[in-house]
From Swiss-Prot:
GO terms for molecular function: phosphoribosylanthranilate isomerase activity. It is an enzyme of class 5 (isomerase). NCBIfam families: PRK01222.1-3, PRK01222.1-4. InterPro entries: Aldolase_TIM, PRAI_dom, RibuloseP-bd_barrel, TrpF_fam. Keywords: Amino-acid biosynthesis, Aromatic amino acid biosynthesis, Isomerase, Tryptophan biosynthesis. GO terms for biological process: L-tryptophan biosynthetic process. Belongs to the TrpF family. Its EC number is 5.3.1.24. Pathway: Amino-acid biosynthesis; L-tryptophan biosynthesis; L-tryptophan from chorismate: step 3/5. It comes from Bacillus cereus (strain B4264). The gene is trpF. This is N-(5'-phosphoribosyl)anthranilate isomerase. The lineage of its organism: Bacteria, Bacillati, Bacillota, Bacilli, Bacillales. It catalyses: N-(5-phospho-beta-D-ribosyl)anthranilate = 1-(2-carboxyphenylamino)-1-deoxy-D-ribulose 5-phosphate.
Length: 204
C-alpha cells in the first residue's frame, strides 16, 4: 500500500515521513491552514529522496501558474481539488491527480470521465478543499471497476485507528492523510510513523 502524507510545511517532518516509509508527500499551494510558498516547498523538496513523489495541491488555479510552480519546485505530480476539467488536465505537462468529493455512488461513476493519471476520492468539501478530518461512507466505493481501483487514492478523515477498515473496504492504490497525523494542527511525527506502519501492515 502506497502512503501519501499531505500538508508538509517543514523539512524535518518531510524527512521523518520519508524515513518511516512514506511514498509521497503533498504540498498545498491553495488556501489552507497548511499553505506553503513555492520557495519554501522547493527548499524542502531539494532535501528529499528522488524516489519519493512530490505532489502539489491546487484549487482552481490557472494551468500556467500550476505548470510554473511544478517546474520551479520539482514536483512529480499535481493534485487538482477544484472544478478543473479535461481541457485543463490535457494542457498540463505533468502527472495529474483529480480530487472528487464523495456523496453517492454516482461520484465514483463520474470519476471515470476524467482523463487523469489518478483519482483521489475525498470527503465533500467544506471551508477548505481537503484536509478537513472527516470521513465519508467507504462502502460507496465498494463496487469500483478494477481499472479505476488501480489508480484510486483514498483520503478523507483517515487515521491510524480507521485505516485498516478503509483499506479493506476500498482497496485503493494509495491512501492520503493530513489532519489524521496532526496534534493541535501540527504534523506529529509519531502519528505519521504509526499511520504508515498500520497502512503497510494491513495491506500485506
Amino acid at each position: 500500500m502506497k502512503v501519501k502524507i499531505c500538508g508538509i510545511t517543514d523539512v524535518e517532518t518531510a524527512k521523518s515521513a520519508c524515513e518511516y516509509g512514506a511514498d509521497a508527500l503533498g504540498f498545498v499551494f491553495a488556501e489552507s491552514k497548511r499553505k506553503i510558498t513555492p520557495k519554501r516547498a522547493k527548499e524542502i523538496i531539494q532535501e528529499l529522496p528522488a524516489n519519493v513523489l512530490k505532489i502539489g495541491v491546487f484549487v482552481n488555479e490557472s494551468v500556467e501558474v500550476i505548470q510554473k510552480i511544478a517546474d520551479e519546485c520539482g514536483l512529480t505530480h499535481v493534485q487538482l481539488h477544484g472544478d478543473e476539467d479535461n481541457y485543463q488536465i490535457r494542457r498540463l505537462n505533468i502527472l495529474c491527480i483529480k480530487s472528487l468529493g464523495v456523496t453517492s455512488e454516482r461520484d465514483m461513476k463520474n470519476a471515470q470521465r476524467y482523463e487523469t493519471d489518478y483519482i483521489l476520492f475525498d470527503s465533500p468539501k467544506e471551508k477548505f478543499h481537503g484536509g478537513n478530518g472527516k470521513t465519508f461512507s467507504w462502502e460507496l466505493l465498494g463496487h469500483m471497476p478494477k481499472e479505476l481501483r488501480k489508480k484510486t487514492i483514498l483520503a478523507g478523515g483517515l487515521n491510524a485507528l480507521n485505516i485498516e477498515e478503509a483499506i479493506r473496504t476500498v482497496r485503493p492504490y494509495m491512501v492520503d492523510v493530513s489532519s489524521g497525523v496532526e496534534t493541535e494542527g501540527k504534523k506529529d511525527v509519531e502519528k505519521i510513523k504509526q499511520f504508515i506502519i498500520k497502512a503497510k501492515e494491513c495491506s500485506k
